[in-house]
Amino acid sequence: MAVSSKHIPAPDLHRVRRALLSVSDKTGLIDFAKALHAQGVEILSTGGTAKSIAAEGIPVKDVSEVTGFPEIMDGRVKTLHPAVHGGLLAVRNDREHVAAMEEHGIGGIDLAVINLYPFEEVRFKGGDYDTTVENIDIGGPAMIRASAKNHAYVATVVDPADYADVVAELEKHAGSLPLAFRKKLAAKAFSRTAAYDAAISNWFAEAINEETPVYRSVAGKLHSVMRYGENPHQTAGFYLTGEKRPGVATATQLQGKQLSYNNINDTDAAFELVAEFDPARTAAVAIIKHANPCGVAEAATIKEAYLKALACDPVSAFGGIVALNKTLDEEAAEEIVKIFTEVIIAPDATEGAQAIVAAKKNLRLLVTGGLPDPRAKGIAAKTVAGGLLVQSRDNGVVDDLDLKVVTKRAPTEAELNDMKFAFRVGKHVKSNAIVYVKDGATVGIGAGQMSRVDSARIAARKAEDAAEAAGLAEPLTKGCVVASDAFFPFADGLLSAVQAGATAVIQPGGSMRDDEVIAAADEHGIAMVMTGMRHFRH
């Protein structure tokens, strides 16, 4: 049953006479406490926060003096007391509330400055179970929710970044805070506790291997506001979840303009793709446009890999995203800056490479310090009208033992290497996906078509265009291998690849007409390998 309201109007300005400070993150704490003291605000505090304030000679009263009860159970119980929550929740214009405060000796609290135990940090650093549980804050969220609910009389501050604004408002309004400002702080406070509880909920689900919990929360903290979203009429913001997976969200931007919404989306796609290739074994480069690869290649050096990737579709690569699985060096940088590029993302960049890229002031250069693990668990989410689709991250990686030769002819070693390369790339191409590969480089990519045969034809045409631009006598699809992200429902898609010049095929299999497709491959002397793993991408 809902609780009814007494409809007591809130004051526009409310004087801050008493503040409660209890923080885990002590950034800016002392200067803020000094400013409050200068405004004549009485400061209550807890544990380490009180000690830090007192050490600077700022008058402070420990909460235990107010409650008449000491901290117990290793600090688990210190603010869970009517003297605290009554002071936060009391409606100051309600006679019954005021009478209760007087009867029980409860003083009002007008400002609650609370930030929480660093649960998210401990979680993503891989803390053990007991340590992570111990960093679940109880009293902090309770005080935040109490004070934010009572924003008519209490201002709630959960972020040190807001200290300066609070001080400015106090100075502007002679020690009072306006209702609109208190509402703004309350909204942020509830967002903070919601995100905190979401992190705890998601961690527990992971801890007990519950993949589809009854309640699923996705939360993040605003990192930056975009100029616009996918299109200029759309608003957008970039939120960080706290996950420490190397990538665009955790990267350091060394130079260039602010990343746009589309830049972030494309850069993430590019870096996740290039991470499929072990830098200890090979150098790899991916060039991305609209979250689809224009070209991907591996080679002995980053420069060579870039040039091979670029050759796949040099027209589409203009204005693209370039991702590397190794350090950006001078030789590669000199080649990349020859055409207009939006973003370069790499684990690192040499000083010489940075100097070369610096000549292109708008070119964004990101370094990540490492590569994401393609096999790591995680979630992927999409919104639909009235709902949220959540699935596990596509972390499937095909190993040699997963491969099954289903044709009369087995692939050669060279074909097999290219097939595995092509299938990894195909995982990152929008479905229906067809990828032609030769000598460790894509030579034609067909993406996002409703018909698999159309994707095969588009990839072949792309290869023909690239060959013509390079002055080659014939497309590089002659003697290539082909990968499909899903099974061939009919033999026509396979026959299109054969017509383009493919000599070997890798695909998941699983069609009702697999036998028909295999027979067509045998008829044309094609080697075919099935993986048993589909990689739809929408």
From Swiss-Prot:
SMART domains: AICARFT_IMPCHas, MGS. Keywords: Hydrolase, Multifunctional enzyme, Purine biosynthesis, Transferase. Residues 6-158 form the MGS-like domain. One of its GO terms (molecular function) is IMP cyclohydrolase activity. SUPFAM superfamilies: Cytidine deaminase-like, Methylglyoxal synthase-like. One of its GO terms (cellular component) is cytosol. It catalyses: (6R)-10-formyltetrahydrofolate + 5-amino-1-(5-phospho-beta-D-ribosyl)imidazole-4-carboxamide = 5-formamido-1-(5-phospho-D-ribosyl)imidazole-4-carboxamide + (6S)-5,6,7,8-tetrahydrofolate; IMP + H2O = 5-formamido-1-(5-phospho-D-ribosyl)imidazole-4-carboxamide. The keyword Transferase applies. GO terms for biological process: 'de novo' IMP biosynthetic process. This is Bifunctional purine biosynthesis protein PurH. It comes from Brucella anthropi (strain ATCC 49188 / DSM 6882 / CCUG 24695 / JCM 21032 / LMG 3331 / NBRC 15819 / NCTC 12168 / Alc 37) (Ochrobactrum anthropi). The lineage of its organism: Bacteria, Pseudomonadati, Pseudomonadota, Alphaproteobacteria, Hyphomicrobiales. The gene is purH.
